[in-house]
Regions:
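N-terminal carbohydrate-binding/catalytic regions of secreted carbohydrate-active enzymes
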Residues: 185, 198-202
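Alpha-helical scaffold elements lining the catalytic groove of polysaccharide deacetylases
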Residues: 342-345
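PLD/PLD-like phosphodiesterase catalytic module centered on the HKD motif
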Residues: 2-178, 182, 186, 190-193, ...
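Alpha-helical transmembrane segments and their helix-helix packing motifs
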Residues: 321-323
Length: 440
């Protein structure tokens, strides 16, 4: 990649170093960076980030790319190395970390860039900082972790694939977005003799159903079954031809949101946020874990056996409580199976207390907060001077909601709890950038 020639700075002001930190998963390096002295320089444009080794076999180093340059982007815009197109963010991820990079070490040198335009750029090398990053393997201390990319609108996806996406590229695009998440199914099924599971939606024909069909052991699945269901029943009918498959329908619940598989012989559990659907594995942000723990596997197996009988909601909630902590690798883990009895809050109040007891920071990622106590605890974290950084699926503007009663002359009603939460979130997102929508 081309490299800008660093100009000799004429400033006599002493420039302090960049502060930078890396956050990793098996397929991601996220860099958080700041240049405190940048506020003293009106011509501070952003950062150049040099990775070593680079992006191609034998490449010594290379700059991370950025599609946002000095000219307005269009559909033909090409990504440029960040020494020529400085990164104007304080968070940036290396989208070129792939599953095979697990266990490798990379150096990231973050350098402030000053100037007035594309032909006037100065890399302030005296202020640069190098971060040494060891990318973890998928399996670590008896816990395996997969995150998908789910970034269809990102610069990285645009670099990899055409728009609109040709049909011939769909499989490759799905694999790129899944980012290795699909490998979790082969990992839990491989070598297993008996699998017990509960599944909310089962529609993925790319990886999940073929893996089930190729499985030679006993397969018992509890699935959501409602009138005219098209999210599970077709798949269950397809699996019904397998000699060792047992399907148990679940109908007496509002949402059977379980998605887990248990290797009962080896004592392993696959679970996480991902539905077993094409969207859940690729375009929706999700994760999967495999816990190597006979103790945890026993609890999940008992849960699956309870659900097999299609119990009512009160019967399912009976006795709901946190398990005793169990040691998995270097971690302490406990589990709570919802729902709880009506008006009980044992599960979520435990989370609220953990937030309140945080000493320095709280980082969270969730679909949508609907509990006011939880939201208040999160807001208080920031108000009390601790670090708060959160990501939500979306943050809507409540003023743009349709069917506002006051518009038709009717007396306004007290807003619902959900509306009050949306108003608070929207106002907070306008006030600061500590809680963001996924599309930010």
């Amino acid at each position: 990649m081309p490299k800008a020639k660093a100009k000799k700075t004429t400033s006599r002001i002493q420039k302090g170093p960049v502060s930078a930190r890396a956050y990793t998963s098996p397929t991601l390096v996220l860099l958080a960076m700041d240049w405190p002295d940048g506020a003293d320089f009106p011509d501070f444009l952003g950062f150049a980030i040099l990775r070593s080794p680079g992006f191609h076999p034998g490449e010594k180093d290379g700059y991370l790319l950025n599609k946002i340059g000095f000219a307005a982007p269009d559909k033909n815009s090409q990504s440029l190395p960040s020494n020529l197109s400085p990164i104007q963010k304080f968070l940036w991820w290396d989208s070129a970390i792939n599953p095979e990079d697990g266990g490798k070490t990379f150096n990231y040198t973050v350098t402030p860039v000053r100037g007035t335009g594309p032909s006037d750029l100065t890399l302030e090398h005296e202020a640069e900082t190098t971060v040494v990053v060891a990318v973890p393997n998928v399996e670590r201390d008896n816990i395996s972790t997969w995150f998908n990319r789910a970034v269809v609108s990102s610069q990285a996806f645009s670099r990899e694939f055409q728009r609109p996406l040709p049909e011939k590229d769909i499989d490759n695009a799905m694999k790129w977005l899944a980012n290795g998440l699909e490998n979790a199914f082969a990992a839990i099924l491989g070598g297993a003799k008996n699998i017990e599971g509960a599944i909310y939606h089962l529609t993925d024909n790319e990886w999940v159903l073929p893996s089930f069909e190729a499985f030679k052991g006993e397969l018992s699945i509890v699935y959501e079954d409602r009138k005219n269901d098209q999210t599970d029943r077709p798949a269950v009918e397809r699996l019904g031809s397998l000699p060792r498959f047992t399907g148990s329908p679940r109908s007496k619940t509002n949402i059977m949101h379980d998605k887990f598989l248990v290797d009962t012989t080896a004592g392993r559990v696959l679970m996480g946020s991902a539905n077993f659907t094409p969207e859940g594995l690729t375009s929706q942000a999700n994760l999967l874990h495999i816990f190597d723990s006979p103790e945890l596997a026993t609890l999940y197996s008992k849960r699956q056996q309870l659900l097999q009988g299609d119990p009512s909601v009160p019967d399912t909630a009976n006795g709901a409580e946190w398990s005793e902590p169990m040691t998995i690798g270097k971690s302490k883990v406990r589990v709570f199976f919802s729902p709880e009895p009506r008006n009980a809050r044992v599960s979520i109040d435990t989370v609220v207390k953990a937030i309140e007891d945080a000493e320095k920071s709280v980082i969270f990622c969730m679909f949508e907060p609907t509990d006011p106590n939880l939201l208040d605890a999160l807001m208080a974290t920031s108000d009390n001077g601790k670090l708060l950084y959160g990501l939500l699926n979306s943050i809507s503007d409540p003023s743009k909601k349709a069917d506002n009663l006051s518009d038709s002359g009717e007396a306004p009603r007290k807003p619902s709890q959900a509306t009050e939460i949306q108003v608070k979130l929207f106002n907070r997102s306008r006030k600061d950038k500590k809680i963001l929508a996924y599309s930010y």
